[in-house]
């Protein structure tokens, strides 16, 4: 039994190492030539591991936000702007991006830099998960805004909002009270 577990772990590590090495051996110019859907899958895999985002959430958010359907999605266009002024592959608002980033982010960067868009998205999702303690509320807050999720959590889930630092303004810009 221990051998099976060890072999499985080694196999998973070998796959991870292989994908990491493959990316490192592809030149930046060759990587830029890849279809957007392939680059998006790479970013999802890389940053979901870094921020400990479950795969169903990691792929579900771009599926919902910009209709991402995987590496074979030949029509995928991550450069979208919503009617609510959310930008790029993961539909991040500028105020959110600047609230969770260490540097000032521009609309152009959010729209044209898919990697940055994914990083900021997963960083936000991780913060929301740490705050709410469950992925359902974290994804709800990501999608609809903190005030609505706080109301839902208080009324429906009997969630202890006293544990939440209400002075934190991660996404309160999303929905005006």
Language-model segment annotations:
Residues 23-177:
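Catalytic glycan-binding domains that act on GlcNAc-containing polysaccharides
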Residues 1-4:
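Positively charged n-region of N-terminal signal peptides that target proteins for export
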Residues 7-19:
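Hydrophobic membrane-insertion alpha-helices, especially the h-region
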């Amino acid at each position: 039994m221990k051998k099976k577990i060890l072999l499985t772990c080694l196999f998973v590590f070998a796959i991870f190492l292989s994908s990491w090495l493959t990316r490192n051996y592809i030149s930046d110019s060759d990587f830029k030539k890849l279809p957007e859907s392939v680059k998006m899958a790479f970013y999802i895999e890389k940053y979901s591991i870094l921020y400990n985002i479950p795969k169903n959430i990691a792929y579900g958010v771009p599926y919902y936000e910009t209709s991402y359907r995987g590496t074979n999605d030949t029509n995928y266009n991550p450069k979208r702007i919503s009617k609510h002024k959310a930008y790029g592959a993961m539909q991040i608002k500028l105020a959110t991006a600047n609230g969770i980033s260490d540097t000032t982010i521009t609309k152009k960067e959010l729209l044209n830099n898919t990697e940055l868009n994914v990083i900021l998205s997963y960083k936000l999702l991780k913060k929301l998960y740490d705050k709410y303690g469950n992925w359902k509320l974290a994804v709800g807050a990501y999608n609809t805004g903190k005030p609505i999720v706080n109301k839902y959590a208080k009324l429906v889930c009997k969630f202890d909002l006293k544990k939440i630092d209400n002075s934190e303004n991660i996404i309160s810009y999303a929905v005006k009270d």
